[in-house]
Curated annotation (Swiss-Prot):
Keywords in alphabetical order: Albinism, Cell membrane, Coiled coil, Cytoplasm, Cytoplasmic vesicle, Endoplasmic reticulum, Endosome, Hermansky-Pudlak syndrome, Membrane, Nucleus, Phosphoprotein, Postsynaptic cell membrane, Schizophrenia, Sensory transduction, Synapse, Ubl conjugation
Post-translational modification: Ubiquitinated by TRIM32. Ubiquitination leads to DTNBP1 degradation. Isoforms 1 and 2 highly phosphorylated by PRKDC in vitro. Isoform 3 only weakly phosphorylated by PRKDC in vitro.
Protein's UniProt name: Dysbindin
Annotated InterPro entries: Dysbindin
GO cellular component: axon; axon cytoplasm; BLOC-1 complex; cytoplasm; cytosol; dendritic spine; endoplasmic reticulum membrane; endosome membrane
Protein family per UniProt: Belongs to the dysbindin family.
Effect upon mutating Y215A: Reduced interaction with AP3M1
Length: 351
């Protein structure tokens, strides 16, 4: 449409220029034709003047119109140039739009592929997230196992330390117990020796009196012979023993021999600790009422019962009167009992 309008404007301009050229050529021809006029024909100046003025006016009008047409053509040309530039831009835009529209199927295919890739990436991200959660759980388990291993090592070290402390404590208790046992045995041996000495002296005096007179007759009470320290022995109980009815010397010899044989039998069983007590004569001191009621033969029975007690106990013979009180070291016995029960309890606590 614009091209046809432009062609028309160009054709009008060409026609206008060709018309001007034809007019100028005609005026020149008229001038050339007017020259060969001869003198006989006289010009009519008034008619020519009118004609010339009319031509001049016409040419002036034509020239003015030509200028107006030229200015209008220039304006139209500028407008046409502007419109052509504008429509060229529109054309390029339309061409680009057409090209973009032609690229729409490829763009849609790319979008579909991108959507599929995004779906695949979403699945991959979910898998990675699950793997990260699993890795976090594994890290937590590893940390827990490491803490458990450290705690177990600390527990083992604590057990080892406690076992060492227990062994040290047991060794100390054993040493203390052995020391106390030795002290108690020494004290007991001293008491036994002192008591044995006292009874030997009393028995020797009574035996000498019996061998010399044949009977025992105590006229007055005698003071205890020897120092008994912590042991309280009532010697008057021995003085109240009445042996006057023993008239048979053979029975006395049998009694003495039986006592010596029993002592020799007991000495190997008692071991080295009782070697000092082999010559000890054990007597059971009866009450005064029992002495009056029982015959003199009860002394042998007392000796046999004491001998059986010694053999059953398996320890050094201890002679006690009815009124004597021997207190056992309860602290030592308690510590010994705790020591025997401690290893089992310590092992239970360690486990």
């Amino acid at each position: 449409m614009l091209e046809t309008l432009r062609e028309r404007l160009l054709s009008v301009q060409q026609d206008f220029t060709s018309g001007l050229k034809t007019l100028s050529d005609k005026s020149r021809e008229a001038k050339v034709k007017s020259k060969p006029r001869t003198v006989p024909f006289l010009p009519k100046y008034s008619a020519g003047l009118e004609l010339l003025s009319r031509y001049e006016d016409t040419w002036a009008a034509l020239h003015r119109r030509a200028k107006d047409c030229a200015s209008a053509g220039e304006l139209v040309d500028s407008e046409v140039v502007m419109l052509s530039a504008h429509w060229e831009k529109k054309k390029t835009s339309l061409v680009e739009l057409q090209e973009q529209l032609q690229q729409l199927p490829a763009l849609i295919a790319d979008l579909e592929s991108m959507t599929a890739n995004l779906t695949h990436l979403e699945a991959s991200f979910e898998e990675v997230e699950n793997n990260l959660l699993h890795l976090e759980d594994l890290c937590g388990q590893c940390e827990l196992e490491r803490c458990k291993h450290m705690q177990s090592q600390q527990l083992e070290n604590y057990k080892k330390n406690k076992r060492k402390e227990l062994e040290t404590f047991k060794a100390e208790l054993d040493a203390e117990h052995a020391q106390k046992v030795l002290e108690m045995e020494h004290t007991q041996q001293m008491k036994l020796k002192e008591r044995q000495k006292f009874f030997e002296e009393a028995f020797q005096q009574d035996m000498e009196q019996y061998l010399s007179t044949g009977y025992l007759q105590i006229a007055e009470r005698r003071e205890p012979i020897g120092s008994m320290s912590s042991m309280e022995v009532n010697v008057d109980m021995l003085e109240q023993m009445d042996l006057m009815d023993i008239s048979d010397q053979e029975a006395l010899d049998v009694f003495l021999n039986s006592g010596g044989e029993e002592n020799t039998v007991l000495s190997p069983a008692l071991g080295p600790e009782s070697s000092t007590c082999q010559n000890e004569i054990t007597l059971q001191v009866p009450n005064p009422s029992e002495l009056r009621a029982k015959p003199p033969s009860s002394s042998s029975t007392c000796t046999d019962s004491a001998t059986r007690d010694i053999s059953e106990g398996g320890e050094s013979p201890v002679v006690q009167s009815d009124e004597e009180e021997v207190q056992v070291d309860t602290a030592l016995a308690t510590s010994h009992t705790d020591r025997e029960a401690t290893p089992d309890g310590g092992e239970d606590s360690d486990s």
